[in-house]
């Protein structure tokens, strides 16, 4: 194993942003030696990402099209006093699909399974190796969030198998008919097949604390309200996402160093 790796582009962080950058470069600049550095076993982690058809320009659709696991031509929203079906396409990507696509496109030699210990003009890895690249992109996540005034979007989602089927024919992107706990709250449902549905309890709050067990119980209660009998929980993911409302943005960007940022 060489002590120094040389390449054209080094991407620190194999989440959604880092994975998409790697895929895009491999497609449009295949002559470049691109390395993706990620210490965890799976590119993209454990996530389901969703987007509306209108979120991505037609000319950029080629990048995400192979990653789409589920597509629906419309979706529902529900509030205490009204509900609607909106005629816009909706899509979901499972992180396992991103992982497989990145590994197939880059090949095993260009994915560096190591922890980044320092990033600057070059990347230092925790195992003692260094990466010297013409371009370095830091896609490992946020810098010093204390520079910003933040709220938080918090969620827990579970992929459920429902005995006898769930009866949904399209996503419920926002069901705000539920009890409002600790801030604005809604339930999100993605019907993957007749018996499988991803249910996520999402809410906005002033606190980053996530009460995992409470959210699990809320999903159970929501399933019971719909008359669903949960046969199995096939996956679970959680998230606490910062929502910037103000602060010192110049200090925030400086806190992350001078390397190009993504994600």
Q: Where in this protein do the model-derived segments appear?
A:
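Short acidic-glycine loop/turn motifs at beta-strand connectors
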Residues: 78-83, 192-195
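Structural motif
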Residues: 8-9, 135, 258
């Amino acid at each position: 194993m060489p002590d120094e790796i040389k390449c054209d582009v080094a991407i620190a962080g194999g989440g959604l942003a880092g994975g998409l950058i790697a895929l895009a470069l491999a497609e449009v600049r295949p002559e470049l030696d691109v390395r993706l550095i990620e210490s965890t076993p799976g590119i993209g982690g454990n996530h389901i990402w969703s987007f509306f058809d209108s979120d991505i320009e037609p000319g950029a659709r080629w990048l995400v099209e192979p990653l789409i696991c589920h597509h629906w031509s419309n979706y529902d929203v529900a509030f205490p006093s009204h509900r609607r079906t909106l005629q816009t396409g909706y899509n979901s990507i499972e992180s396992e699909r991103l992982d497989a696509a990145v590994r197939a496109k880059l090949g095993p030699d260009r994915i560096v399974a190591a922890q980044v210990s320092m990033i600057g003009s070059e990347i230092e890895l925790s195992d003692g190796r260094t990466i010297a690249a013409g371009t370095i992109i830091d896609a490992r996540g946020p810098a010093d969030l204390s520079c910003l005034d933040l709220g938080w979007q918090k969620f827990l989602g579970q992929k459920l198998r429902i005995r006898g089927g769930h009866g949904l024919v399209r996503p419920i992107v926002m069901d705000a008919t539920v009890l409002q706990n600790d801030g604005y709250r809604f339930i999100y449902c993605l019907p993957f097949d007749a018996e499988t549905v991803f249910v996520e309890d999402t809410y906005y709050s002033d606190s980053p604390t996530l009460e995992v067990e409470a959210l699990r119980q809320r999903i159970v209660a929501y399933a019971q309200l719909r008359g669903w009998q949960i046969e199995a929980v096939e996956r679970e993911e959680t998230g606490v996402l910062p929502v910037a409302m103000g602060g010192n943005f110049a200090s925030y960007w400086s806190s992350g160093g001078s390397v190009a940022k993504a994600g």
